[in-house]
């Protein structure tokens, strides 16, 4: 009867691999953990572009943007007050109003200080101004 020779990894080899994986994890995890903030900013910019497109469609149908008082709600249900919508789309312009990635409502001002309307998120801190992740993200950034 012949004996087969089995080959495998020694305990030392396995420990070396575990140490290498630990070092890689220590280098990679901090890099990955900083990305959620960048992802939230990217989501906010995408939302702002989509809402701005809905506002442009509203203007095409009604010859004016909703007033600040009518707000973004005018994209979901027919607004009251002036300016009266002349040809409001019965299905609305958005199914529902999104909130920014930090859970706050998007801000809307018409006429805007930077264009026909200002549409923006207050950033991570939920307050006007700020820097880095707390900075406002607006349609003037796109």
UniProtKB/Swiss-Prot annotation:
<dbReference type="InterPro" id="IPR000983">
    <property type="entry name" value="Bac_GSPG_pilin"/>
</dbReference>
<keyword id="KW-0813">Transport</keyword>
<keyword id="KW-0488">Methylation</keyword>
<feature type="propeptide" description="Leader sequence">
    <location>
        <begin position="1"/>
        <end position="8"/>
    </location>
</feature>
<keyword id="KW-0997">Cell inner membrane</keyword>
<keyword id="KW-0812">Transmembrane</keyword>
<keyword id="KW-1133">Transmembrane helix</keyword>
<comment type="function">
    <text>Core component of the type II secretion system required for the energy-dependent secretion of extracellular factors such as proteases and toxins from the periplasm. Pseudopilin (pilin-like) protein that polymerizes to form the pseudopilus. Further polymerization triggers pseudopilus growth. Type II pseudopilus confers increased bacterial adhesive capabilities.</text>
</comment>
<feature type="modified residue" description="N-methylphenylalanine">
    <location>
        <position position="9"/>
    </location>
</feature>
<dbReference type="InterPro" id="IPR010054">
    <property type="entry name" value="Type2_sec_GspG"/>
</dbReference>
<dbReference type="GO" id="GO:0005886">
    <property type="term" value="C:plasma membrane"/>
</dbReference>
<dbReference type="GO" id="GO:0015628">
    <property type="term" value="P:protein secretion by the type II secretion system"/>
</dbReference>
<keyword id="KW-0472">Membrane</keyword>
<feature type="region of interest" description="Disordered">
    <location>
        <begin position="121"/>
        <end position="142"/>
    </location>
</feature>
<dbReference type="GO" id="GO:0015627">
    <property type="term" value="C:type II protein secretion system complex"/>
</dbReference>
<dbReference type="InterPro" id="IPR012902">
    <property type="entry name" value="N_methyl_site"/>
</dbReference>
<dbReference type="InterPro" id="IPR050470">
    <property type="entry name" value="T4P/T2SS_Core"/>
</dbReference>
<dbReference type="InterPro" id="IPR013545">
    <property type="entry name" value="T2SS_protein-GspG_C"/>
</dbReference>
<dbReference type="Pfam" id="PF07963">
    <property type="entry name" value="N_methyl"/>
</dbReference>
<comment type="subunit">
    <text>Type II secretion system is composed of four main components: the outer membrane complex, the inner membrane complex, the cytoplasmic secretion ATPase and the periplasm-spanning pseudopilus. Forms homomultimers. Interacts with pseudopilin tip ternary complex made of XcpX, XcpU, XcpV and XcpW. Interacts with PilA.</text>
</comment>
<feature type="transmembrane region" description="Helical">
    <location>
        <begin position="9"/>
        <end position="29"/>
    </location>
</feature>
<comment type="similarity">
    <text>Belongs to the GSP G family.</text>
</comment>
<dbReference type="Pfam" id="PF08334">
    <property type="entry name" value="T2SSG"/>
</dbReference>
<dbReference type="InterPro" id="IPR045584">
    <property type="entry name" value="Pilin-like"/>
</dbReference>
<keyword id="KW-1003">Cell membrane</keyword>
<keyword id="KW-0653">Protein transport</keyword>
<protein>
    <recommendedName>
        <fullName>Type II secretion system core protein G</fullName>
    </recommendedName>
</protein>
């Amino acid at each position: 009867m012949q004996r087969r020779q089995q080959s495998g990894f020694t305990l030392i080899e396995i420990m070396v691999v575990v140490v290498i994986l630990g070092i890689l994890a220590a280098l990679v995890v901090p890099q990955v953990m900083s990305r959620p903030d960048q992802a939230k900013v990217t989501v906010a910019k995408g939302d702002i572009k989509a809402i701005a497109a809905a506002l442009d469609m509203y203007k095409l149908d009604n010859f004016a943007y909703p007033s600040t008082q009518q707000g973004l709600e005018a994209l979901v249900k027919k607004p009251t007050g002036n300016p009266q919508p002349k040809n409001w789309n019965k299905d609305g312009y958005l199914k529902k109003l999104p909130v920014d990635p930090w859970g706050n409502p998007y801000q809307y001002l018409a006429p805007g200080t930077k264009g026909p309307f200002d549409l923006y998120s207050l950033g991570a801190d939920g307050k006007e101004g700020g820097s880095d992740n707390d900075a406002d993200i607006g349609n003037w950034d796109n």
